[in-house]
Amino acid sequence: MAAITENLSNLKVSGDEEKEKIKMHPYGINVIGVKQVPKSKVSTLPKAEERDVNTLLEKYKDSIEELKIKCKDVLSLNGNDPGIDLIYDDLFLLRYILSKKNNLKKAEEAIRICCKWRADPEVREQMLKPVADNTWTEAPVYKSFCKHMVFGVLGSQVDGGILFYLRDGLGEPNAVFESLSRDDFLKIGFQSREYVYRWCDTETRRLGRFVKAMFIIDMNKVKLSQMPDSRVQKCYAELGEFSENNNPQMVDKYLIVNAPSFIPWFIKIIGPLFPRSMMEKFDIFPSTPNLGESEFGKTWINLEYLPDYLGGTFPTKDLPKELSGELVQRGDGDLNKITVGRRSRKYCEVMTPTKGKVDYKFALVSKGVYLTAMFHKNPKEVNKEQESPDQIVIQEKLKISAENGVYSGVWEVPESGILIVELSNAHSRFTGKTVKWNLDFI
């Protein structure tokens, strides 16, 4: 795979500029409607002077040189894999200078966090490599994410910047932790931002113009009950802090369209959780005219691939499945449901015909319970307290909570018998707990 951080000189094509052949970057290959602008047209784009890289490099050259000295030790941490590693050059430093408004102390702090994070072997292998290989969307955790969230990329801005859509009204975002742990959620968030950042950095280097992302958040038919709960809010806030350090100058706007009347209030409530610089990029677009019919839309978006429900000309029926809502899981999927009353215990079980493995999944609607798993060789010897003489502890007593998302994995059982899981709510004086669960012998 060609590295997406190739230098500008490597992407130039000789010959008539009007017939310039543009090499599509790897992340746009599988996206419908991406249009890359020829270099010869850069001066005609909106905010041409404001986003000109060479002008900004010259303006902040002294700050760049100072940061090079201050950050020399961490800038040397960069690896040698062009598919994974960014180019730690003047443009890289300029991003931080602009984002931190030329506060070099804050810029240095963020650069150090970013470089150390990217140098971590586990991060490189688990987070960055799948994005570099363009395989991250094939992972089971990503597919589980798509059962609850409707999001994806379609078309592009007039300068080739990415258009990232979120359609909250079609999804069930607060059910996401029935399929994912909190760490899984954050992993998809980190990888999504890496994908967007790579896209923007590639085009920025090719054009010599800061190319940024635009997130279009469609709130059509969203109910207040569908708005992110505290668990999702905390994850989004952590991802916002992450982007502050790792993805400077990546986002131009978070554009909210079809906003219900309660959205300004909701944003005011959750705003303190997020970085101020992130909240400053949120815009609530008026209901009329439609985005595609507005001056802003006509100026910034290739309307041919803007969905028709937003005033563009791309048919809704032709939307990719990740944006149509057809991947969303309605109901509880493969999960059973059990209610554990206050001061009580409930049990889940699965028969095991031989030595093998049991795939388990437990998700709470709210709060937490204590979980213990025991294996019993002879089901007939299990008494009413769910104990037997030769029982084997498979999982020691562990508190699982809604806050941490789904608790899932694989337990090994030694032979034929029965695995019994105790869910204890004995500690709760007043409230029962609802647990969604599944056990499968594999």
Task: State the predicted function of each range.
Residues 2-442:
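Basic, amphipathic alpha-helical/coil surface patches used to engage anionic, phosphate-bearing ligands
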